């Protein structure tokens, strides 16, 4: 059984409170929030005021994914928003080890994300310190993209790296997740699946979350 983190990027922003309440009732394990700056990725989403508002009504831990340049500038703000996981991109951090330590020192779980074309070797020197590895199975920036199949073998390679290093990190995958791709990722060793469009575009999002969780 995998854990599920529905992505609020696919929620109805005119009725965000309603959608968060729905997720509270659901079997979702986390709420995934994507912060985009229009520089690191070609889109702008939302920032800390929205995350703070969500945290006031959310009953699930917040999984905050920063798709921005220089994410180390915002560690304290993310903490103050009530984040459980703070995820930064390896590609956006010159001093990745330092950023991971800053996140942990702030009292959050430290996570590092890799874009589809980034090799897993980028994690080699920090994997032992991580709580979570987020593998992108689409190129980040927009919801509703098609799944990149190479993510499946990437999950297996990160799983091996975690075992060899003695790390306790879990593996999360984000992008193009549905029942078919989710089953393949779970079989490969993924612990958490981020699902946006597949959940929020379904006729019964709560039932869809429950179905994903049974994979």
Please give the residue ranges for each predicted region.
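Glycine-rich beta-strand-to-loop/alpha-helix junction loops that act as flexible
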Residues: 173-176, 194-198
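Acidic, divalent-metal-coordinating active-site segment for phosphoryl/phosphodiester hydrolysis
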Residues: 176-188
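Catalytic cores of soluble, metal-dependent hydrolases
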Residues: 183-184, 193, 201-202
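Short, acidic/turn-prone active-site loops that include or flank metal/cofactor-
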Residues: 90-93, 115-117, 138-141, 197-200
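Conserved N-terminal beta1-alpha1 strand-loop-helix module at the mouth
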Residues: 1-87, 92-95, 102, 110, ...
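Predominantly soluble domains enriched in secretory-pathway, periplasmic, or organellar proteins
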Residues: 100-102, 118
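Short acidic loop-to-helix transition motifs that present clustered carboxylates
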Residues: 117-119, 178
């Amino acid at each position: 059984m995998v854990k599920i983190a529905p992505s609020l990027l696919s929620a109805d922003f005119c009725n965000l409170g309603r959608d968060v309440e729905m997720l509270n009732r659901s079997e979702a394990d986390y709420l995934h929030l994507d912060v985009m700056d229009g520089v690191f990725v070609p889109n702008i989403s939302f920032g800390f005021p929205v995350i703070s508002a969500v945290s006031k009504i959310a009953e699930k831990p917040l999984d905050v994914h920063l798709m921005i340049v220089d994410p180390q500038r915002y560690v304290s703000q993310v903490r103050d928003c009530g984040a459980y996981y703070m995820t930064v991109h390896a590609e956006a951090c010159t001093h990745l080890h330092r950023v991971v330590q800053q996140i942990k020192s702030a009292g959050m779980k430290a996570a590092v994300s890799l874009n589809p074309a980034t090799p897993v070797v980028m994690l080699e020197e920090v994997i032992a310190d991580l709580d979570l590895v987020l593998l992108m199975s689409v190129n980040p920036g927009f919801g509703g993209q098609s799944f990149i199949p190479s993510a499946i073998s990437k999950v297996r390679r990160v799983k091996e790296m975690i075992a060899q290093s003695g790390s306790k990190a879990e593996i999360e995958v984000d992008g193009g997740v549905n029942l078919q791709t989710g089953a393949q990722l779970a079989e490969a060793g993924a612990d958490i699946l981020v699902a946006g469009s597949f959940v929020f575009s379904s006729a019964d999002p709560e039932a869809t979350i429950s179905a994903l969780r049974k994979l």
